[in-house]
Amino acid sequence: MPNETLHIDIGVCTYRRPELAETLRSLAAMNVPERARLRVIVADNDAEPSARALVEGLRPEMPFDILYVHCPHSNISIARNCCLDNSTGDFLAFLDDDETVSGDWLTRLLETARTTGAAAVLGPVRAHYGPTAPRWMRSGDFHSTLPVWAKGEIRTGYTCNALLRRDAASLLGRRFKLSLGKSGGEDTDFFTGMHCAGGTIAFSPEAWVHEPVPENRASLAWLAKRRFRSGQTHGRLLAEKAHGLRQAWNIALAGAKSGFCATAAVLCFPSAARRNRFALRAVLHAGVISGLLGLKEIEQYGAREVTSA
């Protein structure tokens, strides 16, 4: 086993993003793990095969194979499932199409997978802010991504920096829900289901990827929309397991948390970073209530996100 060649696929879902070129170039420049054979799967989610020319133009620069797959309909779950369906490797990594990887990114993810035996490994995402980003956003680092621990374990995850062990029992046949492909939250749902099926999720703290924060995302309004949608996903997952009095309790608890955080935001008014962090938590818990009540989820993928997706 240690001396066998590992086959690793890297899935990149894309939708009209020229930044994909830098993502692919960063993969070409990274250190390849020992005894590993790599392949990149680019899943183009645009109605037209708009990324094909970019991928074909970069193909001569790539030290490993690229599989371009056109999977239209502007539904991110279709693109993610396309990567799953076309993966033949021992592992499948996921990366966003506006990110660049550090030199040892894949090596670190693979080391953690080997030492922990986890079904999935997550890495951190470091946000890079432009000069027009508010000071509170930079100081509070509101856009970087890390996993969340609950009672000492990671119970859900994200696809912006992840490695999946394809033969893990908790992942066999698992797919991203098409119903969440425009609203988002499909990755939270995917990893939550994997964890509930017995799959463990590990964290590789040195497996860094880097993500620029475009100007249209460097606002409190954009973050609030994102947090509300995240809350909706969490509320929907809670609603699937709770009914009657338990459902009422969850709604009351989310309301209390939202109220507490809103009050804390007012009390922290002099500190913009603390004030906005509490305000965003209040919005998240309001989203949980929305999800518990089954209200329509915000759409964040597809034509409405052309300039920022």
Swiss-Prot record:
It comes from the Bacteria. It is found in: Cell inner membrane. Keywords: Cell inner membrane, Cell membrane, Exopolysaccharide synthesis, Glycosyltransferase, Membrane, Plasmid, Transferase. The keyword Membrane applies. The keyword Glycosyltransferase applies. Its main location: membrane. Belongs to the glycosyltransferase 2 family. PANTHER family: GALACTOFURANOSYLTRANSFERASE GLFT2, RHAMNOSYLTRANSFERASE WBBL. This is Succinoglycan biosynthesis protein ExoM. It comes from Rhizobium meliloti (strain 1021) (Ensifer meliloti).
